[in-house]
């Protein structure tokens, strides 16, 4: 989906925030003991600490003893969390503390603090019976940056669009000779001069595009739109002078009636649909590439939990592709009376069979060390295996086929791996039934 690892990492961060928002929104507490605190990047920890001390004094006057104690406890937890930071991190700080009531009716303390993946320019302090996640949701609004090149016979404009913010990066005018009807021996010379000037103009546009849209050898925009009223945009897109890295990012060629800034505005209007579908298109392209590996039988692919984990351990996975709602769980169990641990990967159907959690020889239940959704474990661990993680949906035809046909988990490999010829030592086949995935 993303050509460069930084974009893929960002998508994983977005997935983590979505998951966190979901769990925070579902949480409810008794009274007003759930604190939501957001500190913007340039704020001071000392100011927030003083504000919390004042709040502690105010909360001491709450009449209800139970509510008073839980609010004071939550404020103390926030104060403890803030002590971990000397200053506000570059992207700001988000803290959620409080006592929530679980589905079983039990009370559970929640203490979460993290630096968001991009700056959060909101200041918030609220005590309520729920956590406030509106500012986090705003972070998720897709803010991919798109580049625009508006080119016609009178000049070129280079701009970007990010969210609702458009910016003109550079523009220049050009004086190209017009076609004319002078006859005689000069006609060919004029035509040659005209073509030469036109060629130089396209070259200048191509070179400027590299300066503006490529930084550190990587394209710095999610996609490019070429707009213009004449055939310059087509000429540019097909030209050998136009950098290959930029060429691969062209999303659309747009016909517009004006040049300059008016043309820029018109180009934005005419390309809104394609821009909103970029993630969808990237996903289709990624899964299409995965299917190509399979149809060409390159051996550079894996699917199913078992093979994918083996390939990860070998360091063979270049891109790990996982369905966003993969329901496989990862369990780490300790065999009773020993230090030996074993890891199981079970679907909801397999979880119902309790024999997975019982020692066959002694009949005793294994000690549960850790349990979490496999996708969450991947999101925390994928970098250790040298892979990039792409989390996909089943909204496209390709995505749906990936989920139904391949169990929603697979990978594109760096080199060919013969899974059938591999010896799966130490893996109990009982826990891996590929028919279940």
From Swiss-Prot:
Keyword Oxidoreductase listed: no
Origin: domain of life: Eukaryota
Native species: Xenopus laevis (African clawed frog)
Functional note: Component of the eRF1-eRF3-GTP ternary complex, a ternary complex that mediates translation termination in response to the termination codons. The eRF1-eRF3-GTP complex binds to a stop codon in the ribosomal A-site. ETF1/ERF1 is responsible for stop codon recognition and inducing hydrolysis of peptidyl-tRNA. Following GTP hydrolysis, eRF3 (GSPT1/ERF3A or GSPT2/ERF3B) dissociates, permitting ETF1/eRF1 to accommodate fully in the A-site, followed by hydrolysis of peptidyl-tRNA.
Protein's name according to its UniProt entry: Eukaryotic peptide chain release factor subunit 1
SMART domains hit by this protein: eRF1_1
Intracellular or extracellular location(s): Cytoplasm
Family statement: Belongs to the eukaryotic release factor 1 family.
Subunit details: Component of the eRF1-eRF3-GTP ternary complex, composed of ETF1/ERF1 and eRF3 (GSPT1/ERF3A or GSPT2/ERF3B) and GTP.
Gene Ontology molecular function terms on file: sequence-specific mRNA binding; translation release factor activity, codon specific; translation termination factor activity
